[in-house]
Amino acid sequence: QVFGDTDVLLVGDYNSYAYEQPIQTIVQAGYADMVMQYDSTGYSYVYHSEAGYLDRVFASPSMATQVKMVGAYHLNTDYFYSRGYKRGLDNTMFRYSDHDPVLIRVQLSPASDSNL
């Protein structure tokens, strides 16, 4: 808000599931949980065969209307060690983390000519 722009995304590994207090605190502060809106049955992390989202995308009300897609890009969690994917030991993009990256597509409001 220092810059006067209310379009805010909070993105990262929150190490908490949707029902846990840290996530609920952010939602209660007025941020929309974009993962729950666009990919509520998806996952970005798997541990002992339990899949879920620890990686979150939250949007301020003005930004939430500009978010058009949120979803995990499954290039890590689905490639586990028993299948021969060893972390960082080959030249592929697979299994470099225990989390999948979360992709976000936004459609920003066009700038008016007076702002150019």
Feature map (PLM): residue ranges:
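Metal-dependent phosphoester-hydrolase catalytic domains
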Residues: 1-9, 14-111
